[in-house]
């Protein structure tokens, strides 16, 4: 079995592959040097096309994941897709996700709406509503004590124009003047025509955190802001309000604690927000459900 996914949504580490992932993993890095999309695509394809495996498990919607799935399909290997059927109209990932859904043979989806979409895209066989397995790692959280900290997790818009980026930064500068500190998690490797990545790299030092450290940092933050799916999927379960900026995640289901960016008014709303933190991506024991499905293959 090969599992293909980003090692941590928080730290934006190199894309990695884990072989024999049910407890006996071997990590293979796609590599920091592969910053250009065509190199990362090629490397992902090569890893899967040349390796020995029976089942490929992939999560989400990245172009590198599409390459891995393409290689598996060409080798007539079984593909299990997690988090299909979701929508992010402002990102290239939306098209990649749907393409992966068409090529996969087994689907573990996170929400009821995603289940219905995959049923339409892929047919009624082997579609399972499991919830988001990554949420199972969010447990044993300390008491929340916001400490004038903001988590910034922003990536280049791939279909939008980053028009909300400057207003967002203006709001954050105002908060810094009021004594808040900003923790930036670092961007991904998407094309960056607006120069957002260069600006952030010039003004912030990325905080390299494990996934657990990211969860704990978010737990004590006043809010999370940016355009990462983690603000929509993980933050409600962490119990922290989040602000969704721009168009990258447009169409993605969200709970009431996810606030759409609308200038400083949305900042004030997030700071004052105290609940509820309902999460449409949560199902009990999602990881166990996925593991049971994998064992049955």
Predicted regions and their residues:
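Short acidic-hydrophobic, aromatic-tinged amphipathic segments that line or gate anion-handling sites
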Residues: 109, 128-130, 206-208, 258-264
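Short N-terminal targeting/anchoring amphipathic segment
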Residues: 48-63
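A donor-sugar binding/catalytic signature common to diverse glycosyltransferases
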Residues: 57-59, 66-70, 81-82, 107, ...
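A nucleotide-sugar donor-handling region in carbohydrate enzymes
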Residues: 6, 13, 100-166
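N-terminal subdomain of nucleotide-sugar transferases
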Residues: 1-32
């Amino acid at each position: 079995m090969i599992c293909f996914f980003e090692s941590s949504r928080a730290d934006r580490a190199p894309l990695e592959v884990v072989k024999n992932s049910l407890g006996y993993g071997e990590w293979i890095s796609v590599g920091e040097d592969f910053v250009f999309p065509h190199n990362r695509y090629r490397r992902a394809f090569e890893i899967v096309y040349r390796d020995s495996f029976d089942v490929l498990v992939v999560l989400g919607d990245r172009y590198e994941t599409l390459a891995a799935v393409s290689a598996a399909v060409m080798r007539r290997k079984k593909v299990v897709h997690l988090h299909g059927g979701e929508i992010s109209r402002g990102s290239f990932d939306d098209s990649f996700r749907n393409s992966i859904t068409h090529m996969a043979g087994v689907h573990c989806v996170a929400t009821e709406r995603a289940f219905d979409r995959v049923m339409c895209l892929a047919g009624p066989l082997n579609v399972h509503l499991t919830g988001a397995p990554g949420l199972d790692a969010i447990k044993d959280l300390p008491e929340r004590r916001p400490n004038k900290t903001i988590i910034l997790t922003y990536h280049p818009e791939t279909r939008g124009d980053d028009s909300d980026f400057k207003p967002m930064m203006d709001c954050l500068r105002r908060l810094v003047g009021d004594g808040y500190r900003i923790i930036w998690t670092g961007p991904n490797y998407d094309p960056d025509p607006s120069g957002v990545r260069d600006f952030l790299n010039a003004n912030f030092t990325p905080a390299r955190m494990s996934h657990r450290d990211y969860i704990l940092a978010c737990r004590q933050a006043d809010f999370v802001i940016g355009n990462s799916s983690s603000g929509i999927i993980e933050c409600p379960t962490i119990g922290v309000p989040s602000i969704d900026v721009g168009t990258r995640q447009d169409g993605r289901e969200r709970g009431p604690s996810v606030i759409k960016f609308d200038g400083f008014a949305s900042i004030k709303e997030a700071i004052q927000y105290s609940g509820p933190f309902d999460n449409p991506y949560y199902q009990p024991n999602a990881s166990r459900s996925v593991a049971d499905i994998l064992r049955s293959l």
